[in-house]
Amino acid sequence: MTIEKRRQGTVAASLFGQFEGAHNVAEEYKGPKYVVVTGGVISGVGKGLTTASIGKILQQYGYSTTAVKIDPYINYDAGTMRPTEHGEVWVTDDGGEIDQDLGNYERFLGLDLPRSNNLTTGQIYHTVIERERRGEYLGETVQPIPHITDEITRRLQEAGAGYDIVLVEIGGIVGDYENEPFLFAVKTLERDLGEEHFAHLLITYLPIPPHVGEMKTKPTQQAIRMLSEHGIFPDFIVCRAETATDEVRKKKIQIGANVPYDHIISAPDSETIYN
């Protein structure tokens, strides 16, 4: 489920070099760098474990790293959701009832993350509506853009304060309507802080239809296209599949994504998540 060991060094070293080169580009910005993780084709593809794995590798390079999980559902948190609906609930030290991906982050990174590192659509709207009721918007027409997206960017920056790198995992997949405000907010933050402070990683799934017996890249190409419609172009693509992604498929993805060949990472199924 995680990036195979021999490839982990590749993606981490590339991220390391990308951020090292950005240190002197915008000296006025002293905040963290952001690694934004999105998913393509299907959910449950392993975004949380991959995010946690990359975070651990970046820690080994000496970066202080934290992680944020975005869940686009209207529920305020995962506390009242059935386990069969959304998996087990992870309880943080400060009492937050959170998506189970926070548990993976804590175990892999060795951190006690606060409940505020889990953003949901319900939380964002709740905060904005409460502010509107208190008159904090001074009579403005409160809208998804900019008020909702501004609250998202505020939460992301708050979560990253004091760290070198913030991993931001956006739940679901590219193309989900409920993810639109979060993708817009991420792009807005990238524009405001500078693209040199951002790296985008797409985790996609390459199916192998039984009647064909070969890996198909077309769904991944469509995911890349849908992500580009938001002005976001992946710097790295992690290819989840039953088996390793071969050279032919990697080259097809490379052409469609316009990324270096070694930024396309094969992540086949594994017997244990710690391999």
Residue ranges and their predicted role:
Residues T2-G9, L15-N275:
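Flexible phosphate-sensing "switch/lid" loops adjacent to ATP/NTP-binding sites
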